[in-house]
C-alpha cells in the first residue's frame, strides 16, 4: 500500500512539474499587447473602430509570422468613456495580464488618469488621439511612460484659429464647449489664443456640462452675440445635438469641430451638419487610404472607417517598430525604443521626440461636411508646428 501511495505521489509530482513547464512555455509563446478605449458610451464609435482595426492588423501580422518569431496576443478592455474605469483597466492590463505595452485610450482625460498606474508597473502607453498637453508633460515634468502619435491641443488650436481667420476670412467667433472635459477646455483655450492674436474676436463663450441635452440657453446667447462661426471643441454626439437645436432656433451658421467631431455617425444628422467643418489628423477621403478602408470594410461587414482606425494603425506600426528595435518585449526597452524609431503611417511620418514624447512635424487637415452626399470634402492641410 505504501509503495502504491509513493508511486501515486511521484506521478502527481511529475505531472505538476510538467504542467508548470508547459505553462511557462505558453507564457513565452505570445507577446501580450493591451488596448483600452470606449466600447460603450458617447465615444463608442471611436473605440469600436480602434479595437477592430487593431484586431485586423494583429491577425494580419500573426499570419505573416508575428514579431520576434512570436504571435501577438491582443487584450482589449472597455473603459466606458470613464477616467476611473480607465485606471481600473490599466491596472488589470499591467498587473494581471502583464502586457508589454498599451495602445489607447481614445480620450485625454482617460490618458491623464492612468499615468500613476503606468509609472508603478513601468509599462508604456501609446495614445492614438489624446491631444491634451498633460498627457505626456505636466507642470514641466515629462511622463516617462506616456507617448502619443497625434498632434496636441495647442497645435489643433493653431489649425482652428488659422483656418477661421486666414482661410475663411472670418473675424467673429463664438465658442460652445463642455466645461468638465480636459480635451474641450484645452482646445478652447488654444483657439482663443491663436484667433485673437491674429485679430479675431470671440463674441461669446458658452459652456455646458457633459451629459446635458438641452443647449437652448447657450445657443440663444450665441445667436444674440452675432458670430460668423461657432467653434465647438467637443465630441460628435454633442456636435450633432447642438447642430439640430441650432437649426431649430434659426441659427444657420457653420460650426467648426475638432478631431473629436469627425465621425461617420455625423451623417445620421446629415441635413443639420451640412456645411460645417471638422479638423482631423488625416483626410478621411484621401485616395491613398482607399485600400485600407476597403480592408476594414471587408473585415467588418461593410463598416466605415473612423479617424481612430487610422491612428490605431499608426500606433500599431510604431509599436511593432519599437519591439523590433528593442529586440525584446521588456516594457522599459519598448518605451526607450519609441523615441528611436521612425515609421510612415496613415497620418504621415511619425518620429517621437525624447524631450516630450510627442510626434514631431505634424500637420492637420480641415474637411467640410457634405451632408447631402454623406461624405467629407477635403479643404486644406495646415502645419501644426
Positions of predicted regions on the chain:
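Short, low-complexity disordered leader/linker segments with a strong preference
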Residues: 1-32, 63, 381-385
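Immediate post-signal peptide segment of exported/extracytoplasmic ligand-binding proteins
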Residues: 25-37, 63-72, 165-171
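Beta-alpha junction/loop-to-helix N-cap segments that form part of ligand/metal-binding clefts
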Residues: 25-27, 45-52, 64-137, 208-215, ...
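Extracytoplasmic "Venus flytrap"
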Residues: 34-55, 77-84, 106-107, 176-185, ...
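Sec-exported extracytoplasmic/periplasmic mature domains
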Residues: 55, 59-66, 91-99, 115-123, ...
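Extracytoplasmic ligand/sensor domains, especially the bilobed periplasmic-binding protein
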Residues: 99-204, 252-278
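Extracellular/periplasmic periplasmic-binding protein-like sensory domains
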Residues: 243-313, 369-370, 376-384
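Segments of small-molecule ligand-sensing domains
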Residues: 296-306, 320-376
Amino acid at each position: 500500500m505504501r509503495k502504491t501511495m509513493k508511486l501515486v505521489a511521484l506521478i502527481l509530482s511529475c505531472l505538476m512539474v510538467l504542467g508548470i513547464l508547459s505553462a511557462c512555455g505558453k507564457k513565452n509563446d505570445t507577446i501580450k499587447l493591451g488596448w483600452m478605449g470606449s466600447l460603450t458610451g458617447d465615444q463608442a464609435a471611436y473605440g469600436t473602430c480602434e479595437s477592430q482595426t487593431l484586431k485586423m492588423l494583429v491577425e494580419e501580422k500573426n499570419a505573416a509570422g508575428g514579431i520576434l518569431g512570436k504571435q501577438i496576443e491582443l487584450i482589449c478592455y472597455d473603459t466606458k468613456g470613464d477616467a476611473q474605469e480607465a485606471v481600473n483597466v490599466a491596472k488589470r492590463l499591467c498587473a494581471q495580464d502583464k502586457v508589454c505595452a498599451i495602445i489607447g485610450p481614445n480620450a485625454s482625460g482617460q490618458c491623464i488618469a492612468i499615468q500613476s498606474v503606468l509609472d508603478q508597473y513601468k509599462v508604456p502607453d501609446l495614445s492614438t488621439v489624446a491631444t491634451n498637453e498633460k498627457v505626456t508633460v505636466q507642470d514641466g515634468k515629462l511622463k516617462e511612460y506616456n507617448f502619443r502619435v497625434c498632434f496636441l491641443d495647442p497645435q489643433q488650436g493653431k489649425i482652428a484659429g488659422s483656418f477661421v481667420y486666414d482661410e475663411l476670412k472670418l473675424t467673429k467667433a463664438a465658442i460652445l464647449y463642455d466645461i468638465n472635459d480636459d480635451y474641450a477646455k484645452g482646445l478652447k483655450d488654444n483657439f482663443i489664443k491663436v484667433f485673437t492674436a491674429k485679430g479675431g474676436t470671440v463674441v461669446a463663450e458658452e459652456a455646458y456640462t457633459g451629459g446635458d441635452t438641452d443647449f437652448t440657453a447657450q445657443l440663444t446667447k450665441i445667436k444674440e452675440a452675432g458670430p460668423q462661426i461657432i467653434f465647438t471643441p467637443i465630441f460628435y454626439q454633442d456636435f450633432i445635438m447642438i447642430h439640430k437645436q441650432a437649426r431649430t432656433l434659426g441659427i444657420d451658421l457653420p460650426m467648426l469641430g475638432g478631431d473629436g467631431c469627425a465621425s461617420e455617425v455625423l451623417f445620421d444628422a446629415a441635413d443639420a451638419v451640412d456645411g460645417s467643418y471638422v479638423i482631423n489628423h488625416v483626410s478621411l477621403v484621401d485616395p491613398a487610404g482607399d485600400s485600407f478602408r476597403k480592408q476594414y470594410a471587408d473585415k467588418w461587414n461593410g463598416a466605415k472607417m473612423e479617424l481612430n482606425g487610422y491612428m490605431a494603425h499608426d500606433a500599431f506600426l510604431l509599436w511593432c517598430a519599437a519591439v523590433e528595435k528593442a529586440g525584446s518585449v521588456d516594457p522599459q526597452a519598448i518605451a526607450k525604443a519609441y523615441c528611436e524609431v521612425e515609421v510612415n503611417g496613415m497620418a504621415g511620418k511619425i518620429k517621437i521626440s525624447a524631450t516630450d514624447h510627442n510626434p514631431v512635424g505634424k500637420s492637420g487637415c480641415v474637411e467640410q461636411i457634405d451632408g447631402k452626399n454623406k461624405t467629407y470634402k477635403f479643404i486644406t492641410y495646415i502645419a501644426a508646428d
